Amino acid sequence: MTPPRKLHIKSYGCQMNVYDAQRMVDTLGAEGFVETADAGDADLVILNTCHIREKASEKVYSELGRLRVAKEEAARSGRAMQIAVAGCVAQAEGVEIISRAPTVDVVVGPQSYHHLPQLLAQASRGERAIETEFPAEDKFGFLAKPSREAIRARGVSAFVTVQEGCDKFCTFCVVPYTRGAEMSRPVARIVDDVMQLTDSGVREITLIGQNVNAYHGEGPDGRTWTLGRLLYRIAEIPGVARIRYSTSHPNDVDDGLIAAHRDLTAVMPFVHLPVQSGSDRILAAMNRKHSAADYRRVVDRFRGARDDIAFSSDFIVGFPGETEEDFRATLALIDQIGYAAAYSFKYSPRPGTPAADMQEMVSATEMDERLERLQSLIDSQQAAFNKAAIGSVVDVLFEREARKPGQLVGRTAYLQPAHVMASSDIIGQVLPVRIDSLERYSLLGELVATTAAPIPEAAMPLASIGG
């Protein structure tokens, strides 16, 4: 009997890459591969890459240098190792990757993962194995589905891609060029994926897409469904305790999405809503197609639907031409909104984007100083948000055992880690926890009950269950 071949995948970047990595594992599992945590022991190493920032793509080439040594060592011991570069760097740079790193055997863009077995076979025959086209077929219809055992091993929370690509063309962003135009999966296929996950014990579904609330998939009635309508359908699936979605664009928040937050108890009151800047001048230069006031109105609409809703966001400091006045407008917006969490980055020019050719670059010193000021404000808001949980009872979905013996960790509705002393038989349940204290970014508390309440009926309005 031929021993299974070993596969190691290292992913960089977004949630979509995490999901894509899992689907590559499933697809290659059908070809006889099993995962290994040791790249040096692998027959195939895949780097699933991110192209959003320069540092992320340069990390890939540093890693390829290390893998070249591992590949040479494997060859000396009589073992063939293949190296594949996947993801957005693969899509953007294509053949340039093999020019810079000849040790690479396969280059495959994010829309072609279902062709990996054929590409690996081509490489084994010494043929060129590069695919960075946007094929007409839907890759999701060809990717292997995970086994029940694989789903269980990945935990009680899972990602499901519902949408890929972006048509917004923000001037700083490579996504429209690396992921292509917006494409939405049919509702029926999404529902099938979610049902397979919940049948295997998954309790939290996160619907993901580069611009997820631009979702416009074909419904079972033959009509185009929006994300809001899709959320109602997902909430009907038995076993779904929690629903999330990411990442959103303010311009695609419609009444149906707001209504889903109002009506569906399964939809978590936590929205990742990137804004990037609080300066209208910079927002225009970014081609965001909304103002700071437009963004505030979207936030107000969400808060009108649920008063317990909280937000996270993304911010870029040092965009070309950003002045101190522009930056202060961003700080003012953060003050006005009040975030539970946020992610901040220094502007990084990406080749091929309009912003890369803009003049008036902000100095590295100014970027560092602004990033520190912005992050300090975000950290203080996050600390205040977490501190406000002390003394309250919050629902926690328990996910796994913690590092401390006898302790479990789960997530609140706002994705805060929550730790309690409890037995592992409550993993997968949503239980009330009284929060007693904080430890850095984690909440510490005690179970109030050890029996989970029934998952609410689908689309049950919040008002009908009290509170």
Swiss-Prot record:
Binds 2 [4Fe-4S] clusters. One cluster is coordinated with 3 cysteines and an exchangeable S-adenosyl-L-methionine. It is found in: Cytoplasm. It catalyses: N(6)-dimethylallyladenosine(37) in tRNA + (sulfur carrier)-SH + AH2 + 2 S-adenosyl-L-methionine = 2-methylsulfanyl-N(6)-dimethylallyladenosine(37) in tRNA + (sulfur carrier)-H + 5'-deoxyadenosine + L-methionine + A + S-adenosyl-L-homocysteine + 2 H(+). Its cofactor is [4Fe-4S] cluster. [4Fe-4S] cluster 1 binds at residues 14, 50, 88. One of its GO terms (molecular function) is 4 iron, 4 sulfur cluster binding. Residues 387-449 form the TRAM domain. Residues 152-384 form the Radical SAM core domain. It is an enzyme of class 2 (transferase). GO terms for cellular component: cytosol. Keywords: 4Fe-4S, Cytoplasm, Iron, Iron-sulfur, Metal-binding, S-adenosyl-L-methionine, Transferase, tRNA processing. [4Fe-4S] cluster 2 binds at residues 166, 170, 173. Gene3D superfamilies: Methylthiotransferase, N-terminal domain (3.40.50.12160), tm_1862 like domain (3.80.30.20). Its EC number is 2.8.4.3. InterPro entries: Elp3/MiaA/NifB-like_rSAM, Methylthiotransferase, Methylthiotransferase_CS, Methylthiotransferase_N, Methylthiotransferase_N_sf, MiaB_methiolase, rSAM, rSAM_horseshoe. Residues 5-125 form the MTTase N-terminal domain. Its main location: cytoplasm. Catalyzes the methylthiolation of N6-(dimethylallyl)adenosine (i(6)A), leading to the formation of 2-methylthio-N6-(dimethylallyl)adenosine (ms(2)i(6)A) at position 37 in tRNAs that read codons beginning with uridine. NCBIfam families: miaB-methiolase, MiaB/RimO family radical SAM methylthiotransferase. Belongs to the methylthiotransferase family. MiaB subfamily. Monomer. This is tRNA-2-methylthio-N(6)-dimethylallyladenosine synthase. The gene is miaB.
